Design a protein with these regions (language model features):
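Catalytic cores of nucleotide-sugar-dependent glycosyltransferases that transfer UDP/GDP/TDP-activated
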Residues: 1-488
Length: 488
């Protein structure tokens, strides 16, 4: 099966979040299942050409693409995804992609991704490569299914091509003015109140993708159900409800070549499910780095997160004094809204022997926090999938999470499971989005930590689970087949 995997970020070239990890890992697993995959990505100026060995594609040469009535010149560069034979095609248009960041608030943000989508299709035409499925990701590629079914329907190359849209976060929808009709050359009869592309008087790229993709999925089962409700659907629950039979949830996988405490190149000490002694050595190393005195009887709670409202830091702030009165130590890594950054800076200044904070992002430190922490906190308001709780399971850092999205699909509350006679709990969770519920779950974890035999059982329950990409890729293959059946 031939798959065109279209994404606006991909490890190791360009990354702002989890989408880059998906794009860098899933295609390789699909190849192992017999798929022929090509990846399509914008060539941002932030991508180092010489470092990655990008080569200009003379086979494709210059492509003139009309956006907003203006012809833009597009070129393509190619590369092989590291450790694979997968071709990566970089859409090069300096006018749109040579910016200071991957996503911008510039007034032509819509044009950037209209051009990207059209250029992907025209690259496929130049290659004369007819994919069975075009796999789109998030709003930036949301117009692709419409383009294939309408704007480019004259080309028999795409007669049997199906489309799949993966929603990584419904909160980001690509909502622009109706001038997009002209800019993208979309038929005017598609734009009307409540129509397939209209949202709040404008045009939503995400809604267009939901309306025209053959199959839709999101990145966990629970999130797929949640986005059908007003609480989580962000205004798109009605159109999602119409497509409910075509909506699926597939949990993201993780790359255990990178995230494994037995082999992790970022750790000073390695350890395994059979010998956890190295975990405390990492904890000691981490705490010493922040000038905090290690104590094996005091739990260390780690946080690695964007410091934004979605991640639950408002309810964290509500109970700050109660949390700091618990007999626990804290290491926090992240950046985001000023008020939350300031909150954690202030904490580490006021409680230097208890709280360590690093504002920014540090990849090595993120690995060390997973390895050194006894617990890992994710009190998210909503979480489409979440990866850090899965890393935490592997590293024996017991997750404390709000029961939402992918967190609900991966974390089983120890006390809840115990109540029903099961011994497979791997963390602690809470339902109610409140400071009180958050506090009680952390308090429970801190109390259970005193019982070393029980704690080790919770750790090993998590460490033995398998969330590798292999299982996820098999499920995507099933969805590709479903999409093709629908297209026929």
């Amino acid at each position: 099966m031939k798959i065109a995997f279209v994404s606006t970020e991909c490890v190791p070239y360009a990354k702002t979040g989890g989408l880059a990890d998906v794009a860098g890992s899933l295609p390789s697993e699909l190849v192992k299942l017999g798929c022929d995959v090509k990846i399509f990505l914008p060539k941002y100026s932030l991508i180092d050409e010489s470092q990655h060995g990008l080569k200009y594609s003379w086979d494709i040469s210059e492509m003139p693409i009309r956006i907003n009535g203006v012809i833009r010149s597009v070129h393509v560069h190619v590369n092989k995804l590291p450790h694979s034979n997968i071709g990566v095609y970089f859409i090069d248009c300096p006018h749109y992609f040579y910016r200071h960041r991957i996503y911008t608030n510039d007034p032509d943000e819509d044009e950037r991704f209209i051009l990207f989508s059209k250029a992907v299709i025209e690259t496929l035409q130049r290659l004369q490569w007819a994919p069975d499925v075009v796999h789109c990701n998030d709003w930036q590629t949301g117009l692709l299914p419409l383009f294939i079914k309408d704007n480019y329907s004259w080309d028999k190359l795409f007669d049997n091509t199906a489309t799949l849209l993966t929603i990584h976060n419904i909160g980001y929808q690509g909502l622009f003015s109706k001038s997009v009709l002209f800019g993208a050359e979309i038929q005017k009869n598609l734009f009307y109140p409540g129509g397939p592309i209209e949202q709040d008087g404008g045009i939503s790229f995400m809604k267009s993708g939901i309306s025209f993709a053959d199959i839709i999925n999101t990145v966990s089962n629970t999130y797929a159900h949640e986005i059908l409700t007003p609480e989580y659907g962000a205004g798109l629950e009605a159109v999602l409800k119409q497509r409910e039979d075509d909506l699926f949830g597939i949990l993201n996988g993780v790359d255990y070549n990178i995230w494994d405490p037995e082999t992790d190149k970022h750790l000073p000490y390695h350890y395994s499910i059979n010998d956890l002694s190295g975990k405390y050595l990492n904890k000691r190393y981490l705490l010493n780095h922040f000038g905090i005195k290690p104590d094996e009887n005091i739990p260390l709670i780690g946080i690695v997160s964007r410091m934004v409202l979605q991640k639950g830091f408002d309810i964290f702030a509500d109970i700050l004094s109660d949390l700091m009165s618990l007999d626990a130590q804290w290491i926090i890594l992240g950046s985001g809204e000023d008020k939350f950054e300031d909150l954690f800076r202030r904490l580490s200044n006021q409680l230097p022997g208890k709280v360590g904070t690093y504002i920014g992002y540090n990849n090595e430190l993120s690995h060390l926090i997973e390895a050194g922490s006894d617990m890992f906190l994710m009190p998210s308001r909503y979480e489409p999938c979440g990866l850090n709780q899965i890393y935490s399971l592997k590293y024996g850092a017991v997750p404390i999470v709000r029961k939402t999205g992918g967190l609900a699909d991966t974390i089983k509350d120890w006390d809840e499971q115990n109540h029903f006679g099961f011994k497979d709990g791997n963390g602690f969770s809470f339902y109610d989005y409140s400071g009180f519920a958050l506090y009680k779950s952390i308090e429970r974890a801190v109390n259970v930590f005193k019982h070393k035999d029980i704690w080790k059982k919770i750790q090993t329950n998590g460490m033995k689970l398998d969330f590798s990409w292999t299982r996820s890729a098999e499920k995507y293959l099933e969805l590709y087949k479903l999409a093709l059946e629908k297209r026929q």
